[in-house]
Each structure stands twice: as C-alpha cells, then as structure tokens.
Amino acid sequence: MDFSISYGIQNIGLPLILSSGDLKNICFLIDTGATHNVLFDFVYEHLQDDVKLTNANNRIMGIEGHYIETPIIEATFNFEGVICTSTFSVLNASDAVLNIQNETGIQIHGILGMQFLLENKCIIDFDKLQIRI
C-alpha cells in the first residue's frame, strides 16, 4: 500500500508516516541513514503494555553521536491496515526530539530505519512523495 510522505517533506523537509489502529498517531521519521529502528523512551513509557520487551540490548549510536546501550522491544504497528512487526531500540533523545518539535511544531515518536524498510520491502518514491509498505 502507498502512503503519502508529502506533508512532512513539504512542510518540514522530513519524510514522516503516522501509525493507525490501537497504537495510533505514532509519528515516525523514515530514515534511510539509520541502521536500527528507534522508539523514543517517552513513547515507550506509554506503550509498555502494548509492546514486548526482549531480553536483548543494542549498542547504537545516538542522535548526538555517542554509543548507547539500549533495550530492545518488539512492537506491531498498523499503517492504515498494513500490519508491521519489528524490533526497536528504546532511546532517550529528549533534547533532540524537543529541538525538532520547537523548530517544526511536530513531535516525532520514533525512527523507522533500514531494518524496517528492508524487512517490509518498502519502496520510497521521492518523485511521487510516497512510501510503499
């Protein structure tokens, strides 16, 4: 299914997609430069009953460029009827998220990285400003 990313790109220069269903209105940044998926910790705190905490950790480079050990969760998100399950590193990036929100007026809740894009065989079409999941 094709989803528009035009609003985010045209208004703030970032490709964004919103989840629907039970875990709705989770705003994800689509980031082809991110190797892992990320759910920010302030969002995880509200979704703990809806996601599965794994026994694993990831060592990822945070937004500020420092390596951080993060817990890994498994979460399922609905994108207008397309159900996608993947693992996410839970990351504290409050300062960066707040800066983006202050500059753009949009709060980002997580990042869909290459892991998600490959697992779900996503195609990003920048001519049409769409992502196919």
Where in the sequence are the language-model features?
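Pepsin/retropepsin-fold aspartyl endopeptidases
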Residues: 1-133
